[in-house]
UniProtKB/Swiss-Prot annotation:
UniProt-listed Gene3D superfamilies: P-loop containing nucleotide triphosphate hydrolases, RecF/RecN/SMC, N-terminal domain
Function comment: The RecF protein is involved in DNA metabolism; it is required for DNA replication and normal SOS inducibility. RecF binds preferentially to single-stranded, linear DNA. It also seems to bind ATP.
Organism superkingdom: Bacteria
Record-linked Pfam families: SMC_N (PF02463)
GO cellular component labels: cytoplasm
GO molecular function ontology, one term from the record: ATP binding
Cellular location(s): Cytoplasm
Binding residues annotated for ATP, in chain numbering: 30-37
Family to which the UniProt record says this protein belongs: Belongs to the RecF family.
Record-given protein name: DNA replication and repair protein RecF
Length: 373
């Protein structure tokens, strides 16, 4: 799949922009704070209905405006699809082929993207929240039911936490048990989907990592749940373990006023040659692991939806050494529509970029003619 055009209205620093793209490589060039990343983010938001940079949708709307709009044309193997996302203070409304979607979960997944930004290099050494977000965003694209279960889980979690904060000195345990059972119902389904996804991701990421490391390293991805469950357990057993675990931490949760276990507390670990790369890995190994995961995402999405996703490389090439840079560009060459942001193409010598369409951005406008590198 590839996006052939995009329209932005009151989005970030773009007042009104219409732009067409090549189906292979598009390089967006400009100085910092001119709008390169905003343009890249707009493509991501069009696909995912949320930003990778902020959870506050108001920040996506141009200053002093009441609404923002992103509209794009997606070309797929057997169809052409119009996507539109309208953002206001009241929330977001999505359209597919001009038809408004009742739920965002019905919209997400139509256009698949893989974002690789400098913060993704922190996937290994960053906080557990970074890794959970990675899981949620990628899984949500290929499994709409996961997004539904996740949104329901988060609603119940918020209600349960409010109750826990208010419980000290009050007898509200009956209501707490109701929320606990609801949390277990949605949480176990989330857990199962994560186990399935990571099994597939492992199958793709391990050989990719082996290739980048010239056969010297073996990558293993391990899911670390906050309760003592495993992939081999069936759904009823997982629910049973969750229930027992919630009973054992109930008084601590009431004392602390928050939910202490569940998928929102889980984590991932990455092992290279049986060593925890987060703790013992070099910066090079950590970056190879992050790169392997991103390249594996591309192949996994293709295996699931039979279309390659759109790859967004936001100021990340300069963060990779020449070898990893070349491996990345060689892998995607000719098969994945790719967007690259950079302040300059100097020092990036690769055939893929020489054939790219370049877009020069300055102060929220496409400042000059589109040309070739």
């Amino acid at each position: 799949m590839f996006i052939s055009e995009i329209q932005l209205k009151n989005y970030r620093n773009y007042e009104d922009l219409n732009l067409s793209f090549e189906d292979k490589v598009n390089v967006i060039i400009g100085e910092n704070a001119q709008g390169k990343t905003n343009l890249m983010e707009a493509i991501y938001v069009l696909a995912m209905a949320k930003s990778h940079r902020t959870s506050n949708d108001r920040e996506l709307i141009r200053w002093d405006e009441d609404y923002g709009k992103i509209k794009g044309r997606l070309q797929k193997r057997n169809s052409s699809v119009s996507l539109e996302l309208n953002i206001s203070k009241k929330g977001k409304k999505a359209k597919l082929n001009e038809l408004e979607q009742q739920k965002l979960s019905q919209y997400i997944g139509e256009m698949n993207v893989v974002m690789f930004a400098p913060e993704d290099l922190n996937l290994v050494k960053g906080s557990p929240q970074v890794r959970r977000r990675f899981l949620d965003m990628e899984l949500g694209q290929i499994a709409p039911v996961y997004l539904y279960e996740l949104s329901q889980y988060q609603k119940v979690l918020t209600q349960r936490n409010h109750l826990l904060k208010a419980m000290q000195g009050k007898n509200e345990e009956t209501m707490l048990d109701v929320f606990t059972l609801q949390l277990i119902e949605h949480g176990t389904k989330i857990l199962q989907k994560r186990f399935e996804f990571l099994h597939l991701l492992q199958e793709w990421a391990a050989p990719i990592h082996r290739g980048i490391s010239r056969g010297l390293e073996e990558l293993e991805i391990v899911y670390k749940p906050s309760v003592d469950v495993s992939e081999s357990m069936d759904l009823s057993k997982i629910k049973e373990v969750y229930y027992e675990s919630f009973q054992s931490v109930k008084q601590r949760e009431i004392f602390r006023g928050t939910t202490l276990i569940g998928p929102h507390r889980d984590d991932l670990q990455f092992f290279v040659n049986s060593k925890n790369v987060q703790v013992f890995g070099s910066q090079g190994q950590q970056r190879t692991t992050a790169l392997s995961l991103k390249l594996a995402e591309i192949e996994l999405i293709y295996a699931e939806v039979k279309e390659y996703p759109i790859l967004l490389l936001d100021d990340v090439l300069s963060e990779l050494d020449d070898y990893r840079q070349s491996h990345l560009l060689n892998t995607i060459q000719g098969k994945v529509q790719t967007f690259v942001t950079t302040t300059s193409v100097d020092g990036i010598e690769h055939e893929t970029l020489k054939k790219a369409k370049t877009i020069h951005v300055k102060s929220g406008t496409v400042d000059c003619e589109i040309d070739r590198i």
